[in-house]
Amino acid sequence: LDFHAEATSEKGAMGWFLDGKVQAVWGTHTHVPTADCQILPRGTGFVTDLGMTGPSRSVLGIKPENSINLFMGGLPRRYEEAEGNCKLNACLFTIDTEKKRCTGVRRADIQE
């Protein structure tokens, strides 16, 4: 289950709420990968946030100067996608389809 939420506490609570009801819960939205891959007591694989896929030298995928301008009090302007090598943040969940439980979860991060 992909749970798109801002707060890590929301994602953690959802993981525990769904433990044993689904095979895996992963959070998305913050674009920052977390290092908390685990299997909850009733067999649900969980990670708070997968991270992002996109340009490595960026602020959430956009040119850093766009983000700096916004935070320094500049007028909002159209975001421009950063260029260059990309990264992939992910998790691999191993599922026992007969028992309907997660038996393994690990990060899979690739950076060019």
Regions found by a protein language model. Give the residues of each.
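Conserved beta-sheet core of the metallophosphoesterase superfamily
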Residues: 8-81
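A short C-terminal boundary segment appended to hydrolase-like catalytic domains
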Residues: 67-112
